[in-house]
């Protein structure tokens, strides 16, 4: 039976899947939702690296979801990606607010992130939301407006690392950050009367260095050295606590979003001894598996199987067949 495009608009087809009848608009079936990728994980797990890997392979851009990295400044302490690490991938909502600005609520973040997602999709770019503030991600997905779930298909990739292994890495990372100028960076913004519950001063490392910076000019060298050691130990301890808290929240969200969340175990990467081995393990155990996840996410949602299309047309018109493939990569 021949049919025209206009006839498609006039009939509401009844599709039968697994012996269940359901009315489905043909247009929504032939034109699937746009896509959004979320890269999640505890601090230090490699979220930013994976997000950039995926962005370079799928023409994406990254939307930051770390509540501390929203602010300008303290780039070493907050572990912002460097221009070299970005590899030319644009980042949004990264270092955009003044350090003295107040705290951005989850609702406010959801609005800003939604605007960024819409803009990127309109420009045929894949939005990749990445960061450690899982409360922001949960608020964005579950926003009362229904913006995200009504307009986008979501895929969540969880970069997981065994907590003892991650804690060891985080401890060494703090040492590297100290060598890279963390102390000098915090000293520049130090204010003995500052409120450590607002803005960028909430970052782990700022409150911990308060006593040292307040007293460094008043004590002898030995006392000063001991005070700095205590501050660094507290930075490491509180970062480990943060990683544990983030992991628990992700595990809760995994139970909630299980069908859409994919766990990628990066533990072996962190156990390698040299950079070459780490890079090879990352590519084989994290980057390529994640690339396959995203590729499958695209194809499963964007390509209609011939049987599905024939079923659609047969139910609506009593016969005929056709197919239409959508490949957004």
From Swiss-Prot:
Belongs to the IPP transferase family. GO terms for cellular component: mitochondrion. The lineage of its organism: Eukaryota, Viridiplantae, Streptophyta, Embryophyta, Tracheophyta. It is an enzyme of class 2 (transferase). It catalyses: dimethylallyl diphosphate + ADP = N(6)-(dimethylallyl)adenosine 5'-diphosphate + diphosphate; dimethylallyl diphosphate + ATP = N(6)-(dimethylallyl)adenosine 5'-triphosphate + diphosphate. The gene is IPT7. Involved in cytokinin biosynthesis. Catalyzes the transfer of an isopentenyl group from dimethylallyl diphosphate (DMAPP) to ATP and ADP. Residues 1-40 form a transit peptide. The keyword Transferase applies. It is found in: Mitochondrion. Expressed in both the vascular stele and the phloem companion cells of the root, in endodermis of the root elongation zone, trichomes on young leaves, and some pollen tubes. This is Adenylate isopentenyltransferase 7, mitochondrial.
